[in-house]
A protein has these predicted regions:
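Glycine-rich phosphate-binding loop and adjoining beta1-alpha1-beta2 segment
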Residues: 53-96
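A structured beta-alpha segment of the ubiquitous adenosine-cofactor-binding alpha/beta core
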Residues: 81-122, 128-131
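N-terminal charged helix/coil linker that caps or initiates catalytic domains
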Residues: 1-33
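Hydrophobic residues within alpha-helices
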Residues: 44-45, 88, 137
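E1/E1-like adenylate-forming module used to activate ubiquitin-like modifiers
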Residues: 123-176
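Hydrophobic/small residue at the entry helix of a nucleotide-binding pocket
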Residues: 40
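Aromatic pocket-lining residues of Rossmann-like dinucleotide-binding sites
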Residues: 48
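Conserved N-terminal Rossmann-fold NAD(P)-binding element of oxidoreductases
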Residues: 34-36, 59
Length: 176
């Protein structure tokens, strides 16, 4: 079943009112890559789709499991066992039928960084758990002048008011 296409101005009018028409046009032309589409990445993807981003590349090799239900947007009973990138692709086109979605069922590793990121994206969101790969991606992106944001987990933390944002070089109490 395909979603009916409606005018972007109607579908994303709130985004235009918030950021302006010029920004909405830039969003529609943007290509954003999200690496890791689980607990953090699935929510980032949904926000990007609802903001009118025109092209999304999703990278993850994992499948949806019952244990994902408490924290992952795409974790629904009917989708258990489905590739996370495929489930999110289905959601994205329901939100923004004009969005082009590229699914890459793979885990990022130090070895495949050049192949996965050979062309620049407008922006990359790192939402993976593996510290070694996070560090390798950050190094690669800095060397290749690829704009990115690195997200960290807060597992086991119980006071979100204490979370602070900082440049990675100033972060403490984190394996990175």
């Amino acid at each position: 079943m395909s979603a009916p296409v409606c005018a972007p101005g109607r579908r994303f009018g709130g985004i235009a009112r918030l950021y302006g028409n010029e920004a909405l046009t830039r969003f529609a032309a943007a290509h954003v890559c999200v690496v890791g589409v689980g607990g953090v990445g699935s929510w980032a993807v949904e926000a990007l789709a609802r903001s009118g981003i025109g092209r999304l590349t999703l990278i993850d090799l994992d499948n949806i499991a019952e244990s994902n239900v408490n924290r992952q947007l795409h974790a629904l009973t009917d989708d258990f066992g489905k590739a996370k990138v495929a489930a999110l692709h289905e959601r994205i086109v329901q939100i923004n039928p004009a969005c082009e979605v590229v699914e890459i069922e793979d885990f990022v590793s130090e070895e495949n960084l050049p192949a996965l990121f050979r062309r620049p994206f407008d922006f990359v969101i790192d939402a993976i758990d593996q510290v070694r790969v996070k560090a390798a991606m950050a190094d690669y992106f800095v060397r290749h002048k690829q704009p990115f944001v690195l997200s960290g987990g807060a597992g086991g933390q119980n006071n979100p008011a204490l979370i602070q944002s900082a440049d990675l070089s100033r972060v403490t109490h984190d394996p990175l």
